[in-house]
Amino acid sequence: MAGLATVSKLAGETVGQEFLIFTLGNEEYGIDILKVQEIRGYDQVTRIANTPDFIKGVTNLRGVIVPIIDLRVKFAQQGVSYDENTVVIVLNFGQRVVGIVVDGVSDVLSLTAEQIRPAPEFAVTLATEYLTGLGALGERMLILVDIEKLLSSEEMALVDNVAKSH
């Protein structure tokens, strides 16, 4: 069994995990590339009454109603604007399709286990239970987000209801 653990550890070190890197304000975030379905420009959405501000509304994506969540609003960023760089990352996870609005997408990076540090005990813009960890790549520090934990089950129930009502 010890040999298997060593092989798994070595495989993790050489292969790494790929993250889509996106920006919110001045910070760089990473999300598991396997959860990303597509990246689109930001289009107007159909606003839904009585939903939190961070749920921008829904859009029709090839016949699928996709709730759109603005992470900038969810993370309480000031001065949120929509311009030509604003994009929607369409995610597919846990039998759900959800779009998240971000300031921009930069690249896809592969991080090895050694490059991923545990999340600190505190964070200013979001609670640490939403973090997978911090990715250290040279001078770059990437905040790695667990999107399923970020969108709590209560919020996902709300998102599901929004999608089903349209």
UniProtKB/Swiss-Prot annotation:
InterPro entries the record matches: CheW, CheW-like_dom_sf, CheW-lke_dom
A Pfam family assignment: CheW
A GO CC term attached to the entry: cytosol
Stretches assigned to the CheW-like domain: 16-156
Compartment annotation: Cytoplasm
SUPFAM superfamilies in UniProt: CheW-like
Key words of the record: Chemotaxis, Cytoplasm
Top-level taxon of origin: Bacteria
SMART domains: CheW
Entry protein name: Chemotaxis protein CheW
